[in-house]
Amino acid sequence: MTANVSGIGSVLQQMQSMAAQASGGVASPTAALAGSGAATAGTFASAMKASLDKISGDQQHALGEAKAFEVGAPNISLNDVMVDMQKANIGFQFGLQVRNKLVSAYNDIMQMSV
């Protein structure tokens, strides 16, 4: 969850720097890319990858527990399976909403006149 929060924080920081550059009248697009946006691109990409890996890991763990419960593993209870499935679902929905916000922000930026 901490990786998700830090990932969102980096997205917000990048969006704020883009807004500041847009309102400040950056001379050229290459100057904007050479600024802080390019420096945080690696950080943003690594945060997104870490978030997606965690979501995938949670889903794989929940599916593994469900399969173990189905075959009758004695140390897995139905409560554990249900809680882990819901955690994986919430993580997936969170990732989906982050993706939707990023796509929406991208579309807004692309529709801006130069």
From Swiss-Prot:
InterPro entries noted in UniProt: FliE (IPR001624)
Keyword Heme: no
Keyword Cell membrane on entry: no
Subcellular location: Bacterial flagellum basal body
Gene Ontology BP terms: bacterial-type flagellum-dependent cell motility
Protein family membership: Belongs to the FliE family.
UniProt xrefs under NCBIfam families: fliE
Protein name: Flagellar hook-basal body complex protein FliE
Gene: fliE
